[in-house]
Each structure stands twice: as C-alpha cells, then as structure tokens.
Swiss-Prot record:
The active site is at residues 146, 239, 241. The gene is metAS. NCBIfam families: PRK05368.1-3. Transfers a succinyl group from succinyl-CoA to L-homoserine, forming succinyl-L-homoserine. This is Homoserine O-succinyltransferase. Keywords: Acyltransferase, Amino-acid biosynthesis, Cytoplasm, Methionine biosynthesis, Transferase. The record marks 113, 147 as: Important for acyl-CoA specificity. It is an enzyme of class 2 (transferase). Pathway: Amino-acid biosynthesis; L-methionine biosynthesis via de novo pathway; O-succinyl-L-homoserine from L-homoserine: step 1/1. It comes from the Bacteria. It comes from Allochromatium vinosum (strain ATCC 17899 / DSM 180 / NBRC 103801 / NCIMB 10441 / D). It holds the Pfam family HTS. The record marks 196 as: Important for substrate specificity.
C-alpha cells in the first residue's frame, strides 16, 4: 500500500521521482477504503476453464495481504461449452447482466481459442465489444490477456495482429522500458514471462495507436502496454499468470495431437523452459513414441511427474508484483460506489496524473 506524505520530508519527493506511489494527505483522507470487486471474463475453452480461474484468482489473492478482493467470474453465452463446463458456469458464474447491474472496480479478460485468422468472425466478437465498451465507461481499469489484447487492439485501436513465422512459445527474458510508470514500480527491471501464441502486435503498432509500451523482450516482443491515458486499459501479450507446469501441459497436449495424427510434425520444445537433462528424457520419449506408432502400438505416456519436478518458475514473483501494483492503483482512484468509475477529482484522461493522456 502507498505511503502518505504527511510532511515536507525530501525523501517523499525523491521517491515520487523514482515512480514510488506517494499520496498527498488530503487525497489520502478522502479515500474510501473498502473491498474491491474484480470481474473475470473467462473465455478459455472447457479444458482450461478452471485452471485459468485458479491462475488469476491466485495472482489477485497474493497481490495484497491487507485488502479484501471479491472476484466475480463470468463468460459469454456465445462460446460453445460441453455439458460439464456448462454446468460449472451455470452454478458458479454470474451473468454479464448481473455484473453490469452490480458494477466492478476492475476487470480481467482472458484469452480464448479461435477457429480462424479473422477475429471479427469469432462468436465472441460482438459480445466482447459490448463488455469492453461498458467497462471503459464504468470500470476503473481493464486488464486484457493475450488474445483479448489482440481483439481489443483490433476493434478499439484499428491494429490487427500479424501471423508469426512460427509459434512464439516458451519463457523469454524481458526488460522494463518505462521504469517510473506505477504499474512497474519496484519490480525487477529484467524478468521472464511465458508466451504461447501464433500472432503478434508489434511495438510499432502499439506506439502508432498511441499506447505506451512498458515491458518488452528482444525475442518475444511487447509484453505489457497501457492505453493512451496510462491506466484504463492494460494489455498483456504474454502469460504471467501461467503455473510452472502450464507449458508442460501444452507440450503434452501437442505430443498427444501428433500421436493421434492431428499434427504432422513432432512438437518442438518450448524455448528456455526445459533443462538439458529434461530435454534428454523427452528426446528419448519422442523416439519411443515414433517407434510405437511405426509398429502400430500404443505410444508410451509422457513422464509428466518426472519432468514437472525439474521445472523452475522464473516469472511468478514479478507477475505478482505487477498485479499488486495494478490492484493498489485501482484502490487509490476507484469510486467508493463500484457502479461508478473514479473517485472525485480523478481525470479520466489521465487517472494516474502521469500527463500521458
């Protein structure tokens, strides 16, 4: 939580210059401290529905040990669901109508599976636009993850994602470009982020649309950017919410697709994820799978537990820090009535007072 500058100590001014959140006493006195209500628009397919819930709930819950968070999951009825996932949604999720009536302080929008290159033809397209447009006028800040970033960049900023020559898949080093922005204050200036995508929006596209790039990788491209006002829309291209084993699960799925004939090539390793010994084990497993298929036998199971024990997580702490900063900033400027966007005196075009709107 931020420090209140209750006197003229020069350290307060110095910390402000470094990007630290320092509150003026008058501002602090008018804050209405209460619980925060965060919406989670979960558009992930059935197999990843509950895992995605856990990943984002975990990040939110770990971001601050003092504040109280109510997370409200919902989805779009236009997304096709199987019986089990549909029952889960009907029992535990709220409707968008209920979300809209009650209001939110913040909104997170997940990625989704797509059936073709044109996002505008996907069943979620129009209802997603409705949610995002409502959130822009009624929610303090919206965080878009991966494909949601690409969709919002297309319909709100006119920037279409571009197909990559090969899937950007693995764990990549990143650096903070805007060190004084409050979203990345006091996090590591260099850190890792997982990526898993076939498409990209470039640095030039973000900047050309008036957005601000905060975190980037030479190998993986832009990870974190914000809307022209500096805060009301936050964009991830990577997956900082991923569990340690998330990429392993994806690799296992792709091996299964190869074994079932759904893909013609054996999947490559995610970049910078498996160690030397693990790669040796998986190379041996690949030979066994191919040999079994050639002989008409059932392929051996991937030794998932053995592999998982050797994996390292090099991104979660920084992800927790960024989400913690995001939640803290929302706490400072959101209205005490969650059906309204900002507390009195906040400029919607520059809510953090960064003069970047």
């Amino acid at each position: 939580m931020p420090i209140v500058a209750h006197n003229d100590l020069p350290t307060f001014a110095r910390l402000r210059e470094e990007g630290q959140q320092i509150l003026d006493p008058d501002f602090a006195l008018h804050q209405d401290i209460r619980e925060l209500h965060i919406g989670l628009l979960n558009m992930m397919p059935d197999a990843a529905l509950a895992a995605t819930e856990r990943q984002f709930f975990r990040l939110i819950g770990e971001s601050n040990q003092i504040a109280q968070f109510y997370v409200h999951p919902f989805t779009l009825k236009e997304l096709e669901r199987g019986p089990e996932a549909r029952a889960h949604v009907e029992r535990y999720y709220q409707s968008f109508d209920q979300i809209r009536a009650d209001g939110l302080d913040a909104l997170i929008i997940t990625g989704a599976n797509v059936t073709g290159p044109d996002l505008a033809l996907e069943p979620f397209w129009e209802p997603l636009i409705e949610v995002v447009d409502w959130a822009y006028d009624n929610v303090c800040s919206t965080l878009c993850s991966c494909l949601a970033t690409h969709a919002v960049m297309q319909f709100r900023y006119g920037e279409r994602r571009r197909r990559l020559p090969a899937k950007r898949w693995g764990v990549f080093p990143h650096r903070v470009l805007a060190r004084t922005h409050p979203l990345v204050a006091d996090v590591n200036t260099c850190f890792d982020v997982p990526h898993s995508r076939f498409n990209d929006i470039s640095h030039a596209q973000f900047v050309g649309a008036g957005l601000h790039v905060l975190v980037e990788s030479e190998e993986a491209g832009v990870h974190l950017a914000v809307s022209p006002d500096g805060f009301r829309q936050v964009f991830f291209q990577g997956h900082p919410e991923y569990d340690t084993i998330s990429l392993l699960k994806e690799y296992k799925r792709e091996v299964g697709r190869f074994a079932a004939g759904a893909r013609s090539d054996y999947p490559p390793f995610p970049d910078n994820y498996f160690g030397l010994q693990t790669r040796a084990i998986l190379n041996e497993h690949r030979e066994c799978v191919i040999r079994a298929l050639d002989q008409g036998r059932k392929p051996p199971e991937l030794p998932e537990r053995l592999i998982a024990a050797a994996l390292h997580n090099t991104w979660h702490d920084t992800a927790e820090g960024v989400i913690g900063n995001w939640m803290g900033l929302i706490y400072q400027i959101t209205h005490h009535d969650r059906r309204q966007t900002f507390m009195a005196g906040i400029d919607p075009n520059d809510p953090l007072g960064l003069c970047c709107g």
